[in-house]
């Protein structure tokens, strides 16, 4: 077999490796989530008792980055162990480090002066885990239950996609409030600027994938569609909702999502089209990306509603915690009903209402735990430097992680990499992203 034949065979093997998966259990998603929360709690414990370690890059990287990496690789079958081992090691460290002076000075709950510490920890954890997963999924050490599902079910990577949209919705509320005095045309111009940047990124990814014959997964978004195109349409879609107040815009979005869901349930021909239609034109070729946009809109709008709780940032931490607890219980109850009694299963491929509900409820639970640990159980909020850096330049970090993933796949045969080699590559990759986030001299804003 010639070189081109070997490359084509490897491409098909890689495509098969990420195809046909059915997802993981709710318990698996819970355990990975808790591993990340416990890792950050361990870092907070160390720097609270040993202020000299607060600026330590290696402590930050070991607990916050390697903790997340290990939870989806070497401890992937039991990610809860990552958090437990991290906390145990830190408690032991605390017992033998009794000479350090504990900080007691009370600080504001703001991070970088314009955002709560909770939001910084939440967004950066989500971005780091997402960036790790998009490369780790190409290695056998990454459990297949965490890879994106084919059609029905939910996995860690499915949750990550929705979480990215949800977190963008939260932050968009701040821009929404700051732009209340802008004219309609000024808002449209602002939205178009964001859209153009993301469309350009989408086309760069599309052409690069086609040009180098990179592995593709058509049922993820379609033949030509990708996640950047979905993100690019959200600012434009939100222009329609600018005519309504916050609560009404969410209600309108929810009605649209319910109508879409009813079409999936009561119009078998529509569902059959989404599942089985030949890809003969632009719409049929990209139907996953086009029709799932309705679900991502409701996730984005829900994020805006939650953002209204965090901005302005002068709210009482405990008051905010109880609001998050109430919303978490309510959204979890809805998700439970949809998961167990709804006739249509959860589907990220079509962004069903069950999927949207799961994404919203999980993110609310994560925000609740982060609020509790970061701002309510400590004398003052503490945020790792790498978290602040990732949060402040999230889109650029996400873009670089996509580019680096492609470079790694062309450099190494990830599919046949043994565990030790996979962990070495992934550790260097995570280290590169952490250093890049800290040292990059500019920000990608739109």
From Swiss-Prot:
One of its GO terms (cellular component) is endoplasmic reticulum membrane. Pfam families: GWT1 (PF06423). Keywords: Acyltransferase, Endoplasmic reticulum, Glycoprotein, GPI-anchor biosynthesis, Membrane, Transferase, Transmembrane, Transmembrane helix. It is an enzyme of class 2 (transferase). One of its GO terms (biological process) is protein localization to plasma membrane. It is a multi-pass membrane protein. Its EC number is 2.3.-.-. The keyword Transmembrane applies. The chain crosses the membrane at residues 32-52, 56-75, 76-94, 122-142, 151-171, 194-214, 221-241, 250-270, 293-313, 320-340, 350-370, 395-415, 422-442. It is found in: Endoplasmic reticulum membrane. Its main location: endoplasmic reticulum. Pathway: Glycolipid biosynthesis; glycosylphosphatidylinositol-anchor biosynthesis. The keyword Repeat does not apply. InterPro entries: PIGW/GWT1. Glycans are attached at residue 114. One of its GO terms (molecular function) is glucosaminyl-phosphatidylinositol O-acyltransferase activity. Belongs to the PIGW family. Probable acetyltransferase, which acetylates the inositol ring of phosphatidylinositol during biosynthesis of GPI-anchor. This is GPI-anchored wall transfer protein 1.
């Amino acid at each position: 077999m010639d070189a081109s034949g070997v490359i084509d065979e490897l491409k098909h093997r890689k495509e098969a490796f990420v195809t046909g998966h059915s997802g993981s259990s709710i318990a698996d998603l819970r355990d990975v989530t808790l591993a990340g929360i416990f890792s950050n709690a361990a870092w907070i414990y160390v720097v609270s008792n040993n202020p000299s370690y607060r600026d330590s890059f290696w402590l930050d990287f070991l607990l916050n980055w390697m903790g997340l990496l290990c939870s989806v690789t070497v401890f992937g079958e039991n990610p809860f162990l990552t958090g437990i081992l991290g906390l145990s090691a830190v408690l032991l460290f605390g017992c033998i480090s009794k000479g350090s002076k504990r900080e007691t000075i009370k600080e504001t709950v703001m991070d970088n002066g314009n955002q709560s510490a909770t939001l910084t920890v939440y967004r950066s954890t989500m971005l780091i885990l997402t960036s790790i997963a998009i490369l780790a999924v190409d290695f056998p050490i990454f459990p297949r239950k965490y890879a994106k599902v084919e059609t029905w079910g939910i996995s860690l990577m499915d949750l990550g996609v929705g979480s990215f949209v949800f977190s963008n919705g939260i932050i968009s509320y701040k821009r929404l409030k700051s732009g209340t005095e802008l004219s309609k045309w000024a808002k449209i111009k602002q939205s178009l600027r964001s859209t153009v940047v993301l469309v350009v990124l989408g086309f760069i990814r599309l052409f690069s994938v086609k040009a180098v014959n990179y592995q593709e997964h058509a049922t993820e978004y379609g033949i030509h569609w990708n996640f950047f195109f979905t993100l690019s349409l959200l600012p434009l879609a939100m222009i329609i909702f600018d005519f309504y107040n916050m609560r009404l815009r969410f209600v309108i979005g929810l009605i649209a999502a319910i109508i879409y869901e009813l079409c999936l349930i009561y119009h078998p021909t529509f569902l059959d089209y989404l599942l089985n239609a030949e890809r003969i034109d632009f719409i049929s070729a990209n139907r996953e990306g086009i029709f799932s946009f309705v679900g991502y809109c409701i996730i984005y709008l829900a994020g805006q509603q939650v953002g209204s709780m965090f901005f302005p940032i002068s709210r009482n931490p405990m008051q905010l915690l109880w609001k998050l607890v109430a919303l978490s219980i309510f959204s979890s109850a809805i998700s439970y009903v949809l998961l167990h009694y709804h006739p249509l299963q959860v589907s990220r491929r079509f962004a069903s209402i069950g999927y949207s509900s799961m994404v919203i409820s999980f993110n609310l639970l994560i925000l609740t735990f982060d609020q509790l640990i970061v701002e309510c159980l400590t004398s003052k909020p503490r945020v790792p430097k790498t978290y602040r850096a990732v949060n402040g330049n999230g889109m650029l970090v996400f873009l670089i992680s996509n580019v680096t993933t492609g470079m790694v796949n062309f450099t190494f045969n990830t599919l046949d990499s043994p565990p030790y080699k996979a962990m070495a590559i992934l550790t260097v990759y995570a280290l590169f992203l952490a250093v890049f986030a800290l040292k990059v001299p500019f920000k990608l804003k739109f």
